[in-house]
Swiss-Prot record:
Residues 106-164 are annotated as: Interaction with the F-box domain of F-box proteins. Involved in ubiquitination and subsequent proteasomal degradation of target proteins. Together with CUL1, a RING-box and a F-box protein, it forms a SCF E3 ubiquitin ligase complex. The functional specificity of this complex depends on the type of F-box protein. In the SCF complex, it serves as an adapter that links the F-box protein to CUL1. The lineage of its organism: Eukaryota, Viridiplantae, Streptophyta, Embryophyta, Tracheophyta. This is SKP1-like protein 5. It comes from Oryza sativa subsp. japonica (Rice). Part of a SCF (SKP1-CUL1-F-box protein) E3 ubiquitin-protein ligase complex. Interacts with rice black streaked dwarf virus RBSDV protein P7-2. Is able to form the SCF complex together with CUL1 and the viral P7-2 protein. Interacts with D3. Belongs to the SKP1 family. One of its GO terms (biological process) is SCF-dependent proteasomal ubiquitin-dependent protein catabolic process. Keywords: Host-virus interaction, Nucleus, Ubl conjugation pathway. Pathway: Protein modification; protein ubiquitination. One of its GO terms (molecular function) is cullin family protein binding.
Amino acid sequence: MAAVKEGADAGDSKILLISSDGQHFQVTEAEASMSKLVSNMIEDGCTENGVPLPNVASNVLAKVLEYCKKHAAAAAAEDVAVKDQELKSFDASFIDVDNTMLFNLILAANYLNVPSLLDLACQHTADLIKGKTVQEIRDMFGIVNDFTPEEEEEIRKENEWAFEN
């Protein structure tokens, strides 16, 4: 059973999320609702047998849920200043992951529609590549240049503004 009432409060209800590799994650409705995709499924009553997430592996889903749990708890906190400082500190350590996990977090946050996580991961990526050359970025993310020199030159001309210092 996916939606089990544990108390009178709807936030106490548990939702079962199922990763692409079949792992099951029981989370509160408040945590699950950080994802607009899952929130819509809850509203539509589509969570009875669990919510399959075919585009998110268990290791990535666990990381996303760590983020959702902290942010859902912070949303319920009363002291705004303390909450903001705690989240800022949490986010800084949370997003300090290897490039593969960062890439997977971006994909998962986009798929699950968790805007704040997507913003955090994209901003971190932007910070990582800021000031780097095209080749340094390729090396950092393991991107193979499959353009011919002519194609590359054409792209540079079309996007000249991006290559200005």
